[in-house]
């Protein structure tokens, strides 16, 4: 498996560790659905690109303080099946958190994760989870060293100008009576890199 040759700062590549099969591996949890529909893929991509455009055009009024400045340029994201496969294999472990190594041969890969939990008999939509990432903008101050990644890191990855591709995976399962919906999105090239700005302001 070629993924075993991919180097990361720490850990073994997710597809080396768990293999390339996208079968759920959730222990005693009852899996209700694994994977995203074509429609959900399109929805996630559209939601990301619409939000990126909104921010790039200077139309995002929220922030700490807002509004967010317009961007000189921002790539339009395209879907990448390899990133989606790596995301899906990780989601299938039902282990909420970031995996250690998810890079592709092309570039280092960033990641956003979200989980919805409810005792009701439904799992919540992926678009609501993506919206939670967008909403972190309310705590973001452009260019400030005071931004905390644990508060705004999903937002900053979403609008990272140099990121070009996205691929996501998801799993819905029941754990101790809780309906859990876990979404993983991988981004390449990765955002949140060192002291680089999320985008250059116009």
From Swiss-Prot:
Pfam families: CAP (PF00188). Coiled coil: none annotated. SUPFAM superfamilies: PR-1-like (SSF55797). It is found in: Secreted. Disulfide bonds join 4-16, 8-101, 26-94, 168-185. InterPro entries: Allrgn_V5/Tpx1_CS, CAP_dom, CAP_sf, CRISP-related, V5_allergen-like. It comes from the Eukaryota. The keyword Secreted applies. The keyword Disulfide bond applies. PROSITE patterns: CRISP_1, CRISP_2. Keywords: Allergen, Disulfide bond, Secreted. SMART domains: SCP (SM00198). Expressed by the venom gland. CDD domains: CAP_euk. One of its GO terms (cellular component) is extracellular region. Residues 46-187 form the SCP domain. Its main location: secreted. Belongs to the CRISP family. Venom allergen 5-like subfamily. This is Venom allergen 5.01.
